[in-house]
């Protein structure tokens, strides 16, 4: 019971810290799923009020993300998402302006099940750290500038049991 309470308190402190840092994000940043306030509302100005014929001009595309269901987080000019390569789930960093691949780090093994393979979560960026959880429960914290993994845990380390659809 004490161990579970300790884990819960640690998790609550992490969420509290991340939430505090997110409120100080740059206006153009979208550092977590659904945006800074998790409302899906952008504070950007000068956005298109209607789509031009044929849609807006495509600026870039990226085709090396592999499988998965991750959305995107954007902070300090870098777009982060999760995908798969070489049998592993990975955290991918791209230049948000050009789409240039800035690198990737392994999060964990690929989650495979009847709902589709790959990660389900969206990275969160706070305080210079990118937090990413793979479908199998691996959670990493990586430096947002260098990609160096600061720490890595798995939910099973804390008694977590993988849901049928994954984390």
Residue ranges and their predicted role:
Residues 1-12, 16-22:
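Bacterial N-terminal signal peptides that target proteins for export
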Residues 22-167:
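Noncatalytic, solvent-exposed loop/strand surfaces
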């Amino acid at each position: 019971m004490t161990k579970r309470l300790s884990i819960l308190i640690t998790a609550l402190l992490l969420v509290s810290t991340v939430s505090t840092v997110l409120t100080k994000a740059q206006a153009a940043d979208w550092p977590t799923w659904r945006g800074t306030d998790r409302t899906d509302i952008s504070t950007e100005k000068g956005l298109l009020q209607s789509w031009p014929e044929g849609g807006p001009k495509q600026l870039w595309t990226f085709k090396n993300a592999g499988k998965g269901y991750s959305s995107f987080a954007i902070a300090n000019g870098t777009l982060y998402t999760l995908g798969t390569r070489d049998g592993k789930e990975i955290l991918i960093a791209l230049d948000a302006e050009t789409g240039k691949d800035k690198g990737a780090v392994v999060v964990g093994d690929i989650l495979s099940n009847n709902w589709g393979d790959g990660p389900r979560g969206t990275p969160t960026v706070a305080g210079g750290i990118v937090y990413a959880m793979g479908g199998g429960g691996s959670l990493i914290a990586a430096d947002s500038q260098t990609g160096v993994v600061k720490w890595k845990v798995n939910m099973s380390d804390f008694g977590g049991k993988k849901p049928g659809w994954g984390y």
